[in-house]
Amino acid sequence: MTSQTHTLPPLPYAYDALEPVISKQIMELHHQKHHQTYINNLNAALSAQASATASNDVPTLISLQQKLRFNGGGHINHSLFWKNLTPPGTPANDIAGAPALREAIVSRWGSHEAFVKAFGAELLGLQGSGWGWLVSKGGAKGRLEIVTTKDQDPVNAPDVPVFGVDMWEHAYYLQYLNNKAGYVEGIWKIIHWAEAEKRYTAGVENPLKL
């Protein structure tokens, strides 16, 4: 029995394209090293799972679940993350290009500014490693909620991850050091609102095929 092999998705922009918000050095390490490691470990776990399934090795199958969840979640989360970022100052970074999502945000939080403040508070309140997400509950065009997930836990269906922010230290520390608030403030300059609009209105069929 063979298992599916996952590969590192290419970035939709150059490694230095998100500067000055996220440095080229961080993007290279984050994409080529951290994301690649999740993929390597996921592929190894899937291969072990296939062998254990073929031999009906139930204890091994059980022991592999945490590795699959952690590394599979890391692959899913990062694959979504790269696509919900865009170079600063581009049309895709303008929330005007996300009319349905903007209307839903204003309806839920009163204003775009109030949403940004609430989202930032959730990100800065996250203890340890994890992610912050804007989620459409129950599917496309659902009620918007700000949620956090620990470690590499992904957003689970039927909820839709409209966009996410990586709050692991490897996402910002080389540039911002302990100024996590600076990273959170800057992230809005590179959010891909057009991509967020697409996810909000149409959902995410398969994050590993985005």
From Swiss-Prot:
Q: What is its EC number?
A: 1.15.1.1
Indicate which residues the UniProt annotation says bind Mn(2+): H30, H78, D166, H170
User: Is the keyword Ribonucleoprotein in the record?
Assistant: no
Keyword Membrane, does the record have it?
no
**Modifications the protein undergoes after translation, according to the UniProt entry:** The N-terminus is blocked.
> Which of UniProt's keywords are assigned here?
Antioxidant, Manganese, Metal-binding, Mitochondrion, Oxidoreductase, Transit peptide
Textual note on the cofactor: Binds 1 Mn(2+) ion per subunit.
What GO CC terms are in its UniProt record? mitochondrial matrix
List the subcellular locations. Mitochondrion matrix
Chain coiled-coil ranges: none
Q: Which InterPro entries match?
A: Fe/Mn_Superoxide_Dismutase (IPR050265), Mn/Fe_SOD (IPR001189), Mn/Fe_SOD_BS (IPR019833), Mn/Fe_SOD_C (IPR019832), Mn/Fe_SOD_N (IPR019831), Mn/Fe_SOD_N_sf (IPR036324), SOD_C_sf (IPR036314)
Chief location bin = mitochondrion
Q: Which Gene Ontology terms cover its molecular function?
A: manganese ion binding; superoxide dismutase activity
Its needed co-factors are: Mn(2+)
Instruction: State the protein's purpose.
Output: Destroys superoxide anion radicals which are normally produced within the cells and which are toxic to biological systems.
Q: Which PANTHER family does the UniProt record give?
A: SUPEROXIDE DISMUTASE (PTHR11404:SF29), SUPEROXIDE DISMUTASE 2 (PTHR11404)
How is the subunit organization of this protein annotated in UniProt?
Homotetramer.
Q: Tell me the protein family, please.
A: Belongs to the iron/manganese superoxide dismutase family.
Name this polypeptide is given: Superoxide dismutase [Mn], mitochondrial
Name the source organism: Penicillium chrysogenum (Penicillium notatum)
